[in-house]
A protein has these predicted regions:
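Conserved active-site and cofactor/substrate-binding residues in soluble primary-metabolism enzymes
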Residues: 1, 5, 26, 44-47, ...
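Anion-binding (especially nucleotide phosphate/pyrophosphate-binding) glycine-rich loop
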Residues: 2-133
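Structural signature of FAD isoalloxazine-binding scaffolds in flavoprotein oxidoreductases
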Residues: 34-35, 41-46, 73-91, 138-168, ...
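A generic local secondary-structure boundary/capping motif
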Residues: 71-72, 112-115, 123-127, 140-147, ...
């Protein structure tokens, strides 16, 4: 529970209309699942982010920084602390020659559109990834042979004390669905993306081709957090799950997608408990049949 004193203090940092108490997180995740957060803030700029993180850190109040809620499962009990949401208002994208500078809340789809409009190639792979660039760099998001580590040159982050740091590509230590930020207490504020000059029509055609492949193979018609499991070395998670006979397997309202077994979907008003139980069952079944450990890609809070 967040006290009235804390809420009043937060009103010094951002407008009162950007502060929500007991906010249902099901409204803010692509899974459409999640209980209430004690306090939900919509951040507009880096200065607000710096001041609020510093304040919450001083009071030792737990907080979680949220993009657009993809790749995330919030528990049925909600979140005891403060959710800092950046996607709604902190999402500016600027073009400086062949360099794109994006605020952390900018959707990767928006960055891809801006790149295409400016005839910049190299970001087409990310056009359909359902997340913000801030969350994307933390996970080193990728698809169709591309990864953010290939185009990100610098990441501006805010530490818990409100200091701004600049991390270059090497310092980010990008790996498969990971980066240095996953283990460091930093919040992504801004990302620099270096692209190359291209032909607008060719870039658009490539984006449309990848979008068609997504629509054909992924269950975009249902709420989900995107791909549920990381790819185990030497295997494909969806293929193992299908071979284990789990295609369409359902617990409560959560289901292993019939369209793509690598996705757990919210088929019918699923709870977080349903999803967690289904993920656990899939993991144990695949482990017992094939000896392969499936690691969830979805973040759970």
């Amino acid at each position: 529970m967040i006290s009235k004193t804390v809420v009043e203090a937060l009103e010094h940092f951002l407008p009162a209309e950007n502060i929500y108490i007991n906010e249902p997180m099901s409204k803010h995740t692509t899974f459409r699942i999640g209980g209430e957060a004690d306090c939900f803030l919509q951040i507009e700029n880096m200065e607000q982010l710096k001041k609020i993180q510093r304040y919450l850190q001083q009071l030792e109040i737990p907080y979680f920084v949220l993009g657009n809620g993809s790749n995330l499962l919030v528990g049925d009990q909600g979140y005891r602390g403060v959710i800092i949401e950046i996607a709604d208002k902190m999402n500016e994208v600027r073009v400086m020659g062949s360099l794109i500078v994006a605020q952390a809340g900018a959707p990767m789809s928006k960055i891809a559109r801006v790149a295409c409009e400016n005839a910049l190639k190299g970001f087409e792979f990310a056009a359909g990834i359902p997340g913000t660039i801030g969350g994307g760099v933390v996970m080193n998001a990728g698809a169709y042979g591309g990864e953010l580590k290939q185009v990100v040159t610098m990441v501006k982050v805010v530490d818990r004390e409100g200091n701004v740091l600049e991390l270059d590509n090497a310092t980010m230590e990008f790996g498969y669905r990971t980066s240095a930020i996953k283990r460091l207490p930093f919040t992504v504020a801004e990302v620099h993306i270096q692209l190359a000059a291209g032909v607008r029509e060719e870039i658009k055609a490539r984006m449309e081709e990848l979008a068609a492949r997504r629509r054909e193979k992924q269950p975009l018609e249902y709420p989900s957090a995107g791909s549920t499991f990381k790819r185990p070395q030497g295997y494909f998670a969806g293929e193992l799950i299908m071979k284990a006979g789990l295609q369409g397997y359902q617990i409560g309202g959560a289901q292993v997608s019939e369209k793509h077994c690598g996705f757990v979907i919210n088929k019918d008003n699923a709870t977080a408990g349903d999803v967690k139980e289904l993920i656990s069952y899939v993991q144990s079944t695949v482990k017992s049949q094939f000896g392969v450990e499936l690691e969830p890609e979805v973040i759970m809070i």
